[in-house]
C-alpha cells in the first residue's frame, strides 16, 4: 500500500441531507459487501501512475460523488425500533481511497483458467469498521482501491455495502465514474452523464408498514463488519458462452422442449449451469429426494405499478426461486426440465401485478431455501462491467468476488471479447470445480 486517503464531493457541492432505507435496502443490512474488481491492460510507469492516473481518478471520483452522494454517506443504524435507519450526508463526508502497487503476475491474474481467489483479495479494499455510539451505530458503505502493476496495467477494486446499491445502480455509478475520468479534461464532462440518479424513495409505491417489519426483524440480529473470510478452499474459473454456443444450447433445449418458443439466453445458461453444478455434487439417495432451489434476482423497476425510474439509485430487487427434485435435476432430462421450471418461475414472477402483497413472505421463503440445496446467481445477462472505460479501453478482466462467500453461486455478465456472448464465473471447492469443468468440456452433447 502506497497511500490511504479520503475522497469526497467538492466542498459545498452537496447539501447536508438524509436518505431513508426502504425495506428493499434493509434486506441487505446483514449481508457481506459486494466486491468488484476490474483489471485494465495499460502499461505505464510509476511516475505516470502517481502523477497522472491517480489524480485523474481522484478528481473524477470526487465529481461523480456529487451525483452519487449516498456512496459518501454514513449509514445510521439506531438501537431502537422506533427510529429508522438512514443514509446521512454531512459536509466533508468521504470514501476511503487506497493506492497500492503489486509485483503479482498481471497476465496470470487476468486469465480464465482455474485459480485460487485468495490473492485477488489483495486488490479490493475493506470497508472501514463500524463505529459504535450510545444509541446507534454508524458505518461507511463504499471504498476504492487502485493498484498499479508496473509496466502492465491497473486494477480498480471496489467494496460496496449492498444496502446502498443493487447491481443496476452500481453499474450506473461505475459507468458514470469511468466516463467522467475519461473526459475529465473536457469542459463539458457533466454531459457524459446519460441520466442523473434518482434517490426519491417515494417513487416506489408500497405500504410503509413493510419498512417497520423489516427493520424490527433486522434488529434481532447483531450488526457486524462482514468482509468475507479468505476462501482458501476455493477455486475460481471463468466459462465463456459465445453467441454461437448460446444459439446451439438454446436449439438443443428447444428441440426437446418445443413449448419454450421464446427461450432467453439467461434461462438456457441458467438451466445448463444449475444441472451441471448439481451433478458435480456427491449425494446420497436421501438427498436426491430433496428439493433443490435456484435463487435468481429480479429487478422490479420496470415491473411495479407505476414503474420505478430506470435511474432509481438504491435497491429494487425481488427474486425468482425455481425448485426441482434433486434426482430430476441430475437425471438425463435435467437441463430440459430445469429450463421449463426456470422459465415458468421467472414468467410468473415478472407478470405478478400483486408481487408486493407477498413481501412479508420473502424472507422466510429465502431462509427456507438457504437451508436446503441451493444455487444462486449474481449479476445478469444485461450487466456490462467491461464497458466501464476510464480512458484505457475495455477492462481486460472483471471479477465479482462476493460469490466466494456464498455456498454455491455463479456470476453472470456480458462477455468481453464476443458480441452477444456471456461470461459465467464459478467459485467452488476444487473437487467440485474439477467435476463441473469435465461436464462443461463435454458440451451440450455430453
UniProtKB/Swiss-Prot annotation:
**Which InterPro entries does the entry link to?**
CAT-like_dom_sf, Plant_metabolite_acyltrans
* Reaction it catalyzes: an anthocyanidin 3-O-beta-D-glucoside + (E)-4-coumaroyl-CoA = an anthocyanidin 3-O-[6-O-(4-hydroxycinnamoyl)-beta-D-glucoside] + CoA + H(+)
Q: Does the keyword Ubl conjugation apply?
A: no
Disulphide-bridged cysteine pairs: none
Task: List the expressing tissues.
Answer: Detected in the young leaves of perilla red forma.
Family, according to the entry, reads as follows: Belongs to the plant acyltransferase family.
What this protein is called in its record is Anthocyanidin 3-O-glucoside 6''-O-acyltransferase
Organism ancestry: Eukaryota, Viridiplantae, Streptophyta, Embryophyta, Tracheophyta
